[in-house]
């Protein structure tokens, strides 16, 4: 609510998206906010709704991490709910991981982290589309500060501010 909508919430799974959407939909009055959930509309319609609606909040998965251009004050915040690691059981990912392991390398550090960092960078790139764009990035996944590999993600941020307290966060956003 601090940014009056104008926010993308990016998810790595539909189950998490649906859970949070259903948990939050009554928190945002319909007359004040437009909640847009992936699969309720085609992608192009969701983007159009986001650009033209009052105080929009978009809940999206994979296809909204990249290739969406919303410039200026239309998008003020990108919230990343979880670091975008590929599902290791995906057949292509699984084959790549096995090949890396066969060569005696650490597949997590050599492949999975770099791929997730690229996707992460694409996700936060939704916010800054031109030299004059500004906004807030909120990362809900505490692995960026608790795990050693988190520094790879934090290094991609334009300005790195880590805040633990809700009141501090709201003050900065406003």
Language model features with spans:
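ASCE RecA-like P-loop NTPase motor cores
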Residues: 1-174
């Amino acid at each position: 609510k601090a940014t009056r909508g104008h926010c993308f919430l990016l998810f790595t799974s539909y189950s998490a998206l649906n859970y949070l959407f259903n948990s939050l939909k009554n928190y945002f009055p319909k007359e004040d906010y437009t909640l847009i959930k992936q699969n309720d509309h085609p992608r192009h319609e969701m983007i159009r709704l986001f650009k033209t609606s009052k105080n929009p909040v978009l809940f999206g998965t994979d296809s909204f991490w990249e290739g969406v251009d919303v410039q200026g004050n239309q998008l003020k915040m990108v919230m990343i709910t979880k670091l975008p690691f590929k599902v290791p059981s995906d057949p292509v990912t699984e084959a790549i991981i096995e090949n890396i392991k066969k060569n005696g390398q650490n597949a997590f550090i050599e492949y999975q982290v770099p791929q997730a960092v690229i996707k992460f960078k694409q996700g936060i790139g939704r916010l800054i589309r031109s030299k004059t764009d500004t906004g807030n990035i909120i990362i809900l996944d505490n692995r960026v500060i608790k795990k050693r590999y988190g520094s790879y993600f934090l290094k991609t941020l334009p300005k790195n501010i880590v805040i633990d307290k809700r009141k501090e966060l709201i003050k900065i956003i406003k």
